[in-house]
């Protein structure tokens, strides 16, 4: 579980920085929010939207409860079936502008159909570390954004590599500078 938490957290943080690098207005807005005394709802929305677009664990599986009939054949009860969390999160019948980075979609407590937002799986076997992972991302991102400035180094096309986790490739290259402390 420690390894799973490490790799998924790393992938999530990398995707957040990749997305903020592509959306400088959102980046500037979240930096302003984390530096204010108030709670930053935008950071939570950015984390949720990053998890929607690029869920670190991009495939899930379920045991089929009853026979499932398809035009191509039958999946018998008891078999394991894999599903794509990545594609579920990009379903245009659920998500308006499904491929666009839009943290504001989480701003108003928008309800989605059951099992349409499942970055940590769902049901009784959902990831035990979900709350910890989101809290960790929030704390780490807030501290990094308060302490350093981040600028994309080059406009290299980043693509999603589907390995054990969904990772940005060739990586996220950023110029990182320490922000002088205000005393």
Identify the residue ranges that each predicted region occupies:
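Cytochrome P450 catalytic-core helices
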Residues: 6-33, 130-147
